[in-house]
Structures are given as structure tokens and as C-alpha cells.
Amino acid sequence: GNMASKTDSATAHLAEFAVQAGWQVLSFDLPEHGDRKGRELPCTMPQCVEDTRKIWAYAHEHWQTVGLFGVSMGAYIALAATANEPPAFAWLLSPTVAMGRMIEGMMRRDGITPEALKKAGRIQTAVGQVYWWADYTFVALHPARTTCKTAILYGAKDDLTGLSDMQAFVKENDCELTVSGVSAHWFHTNDDLAVFDAWLKNQTARVAG
């Protein structure tokens, strides 16, 4: 997810359940995240998707069955990267399924027009938020979609993806949706992680069984 890393609580919990089931886990940081902070590659959608495709190709070279776990914008990126070679199953935590709507809303909040972004290519606000024209055009051309068996855990208090957008995505893509009444977008409190663990236990048992 945005400003997260491969060592965050959600990923650590996922890895624990996966290893207990006898699976192996590949986890990596997006550009400008975790161990990749301070390097030259920008965290744009095209770059993130390209990186994810490389990891995906590596996974398929080494294992016959490959599942997917993604969080927030990482879930969107993973779905875009694997569109032509879908996973056996996907588990998504707080996925940003309406990425275009979210970016447009943030731009309106910050007083940035599409015309200004197209002209500049990149705009950084006073608080550090960075907008890329490459992202704006990419998400317009690549709406979130999934064609594999997909389970989603979503917080009822999520302020980045509205419930109506989530329900529309679930219906259109025939996903399984679990809503946590105690959670917002970022699952990190003890209550959040308890819900997440119960969800992971259920999903792991269903796939392993």
C-alpha cells in the first residue's frame, strides 16, 4: 500500500498463515517504499506494474500454483500487472478498486486540474503529495478488474474507497466481500488484526482444503 512496506503487520500476518499452510511467500517493496526508498525509480503506476510483472514472471517460473495478496493501491497494481496471467486466487485487503475516482478526488481537494497535470507531467503539493500524469492516464485506461476467485476484506470506515464503489466492484467481478465494522482503510490496530487473522484463517483453510 501507499507508504507501506513488505514488513508491515498485514504482510507479516499473511506470511505466517501461508507458511503454516505449507506455502512459500514472495513479498517486495514498490519504488520509493521500504527498502527501495531513496532510489532513482519513481513510484508511478506504469513503473509499479512493470516491477510487479517481473516478480509475477519469477513466481510462475518456480511454482505451478501462484496466489495473490495485495493491500490498498498495491492490490490495484497487482490486478493490473496480472491481468493477462491471472492468479489461482486473490486475497485483497482494503483494495482501491476505484483508483481513478480516488485520484480525481484528491486532485480536486488540492486544486489541481487535469490540464495542469498534463502540462507539468508531475506536480508535488506543499505537503508532499505527488501527482503524475502517467498515473492519471494509466488508471483511466486500466480500471480494476479480476477474473480469478477473489476474496476481499474491507473496513466499513474506509475513507478512500466508498462502500458503493466496493459493492459495485464485487458485483461486477463476482468477488466475496467481508466487511469489518471496526476497521478503516488501514488495518493496524489489535482489533483490526484480529479480524484480519480470522479472515486469513478462513481463506487459508478454504484454499488448502
Each language-model region and where it sits:
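Alpha/beta-hydrolase active-site loop signature
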Residues: 3, 30-35, 97, 184-185
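Conserved alpha/beta-hydrolase
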Residues: 15-37
